[in-house]
Amino acid sequence: EEHYPLKDMNINALCETIMEKAKTNFKPEVEAVLNVPRVNIKTNAEALERILLYLLRNAALHTDNGKITLEFKKRSAHTGQFIITDTGTGIPTEIKGKLFKPFAEIHDLTQGNGLGLPTCSLIAYKLNGTLHLDNEYKKGTRFVLELHDK
């Protein structure tokens, strides 16, 4: 199927649930920060949860202290961004270009089968969106999931 069915939903409640699930993987010194307004967007809850949970759990693997943040910013009438930021070790430059390639041999960065980020990227596409690494961010790692509800 090309795209997921989208439905209008309150993302604040959804993100609270996702963060609660992800927090079970956080180290004790890591603070979970949720900054998501009470707005509705058209999305697919299950698909969105798969991406955000993966990114938050991956952040948890590489963050020993500080915080992991999940926020949402409305960029325009039909565009919003979910931003996942951590204060972890960051991603080595030589690996950044391979992150979204299936089976890139970066086992220290992803859990399990190496399919994580490429799969998340495909799910993002099916949600009318894109997933990318913010290369400008230097205090850890920041991923941006941009969704269009058109």
What label would you give each PLM region?
Residues 58-60:
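Short helix-loop "hinge" at the ATP-lid/N-box region of the Bergerat-fold HATPase_c
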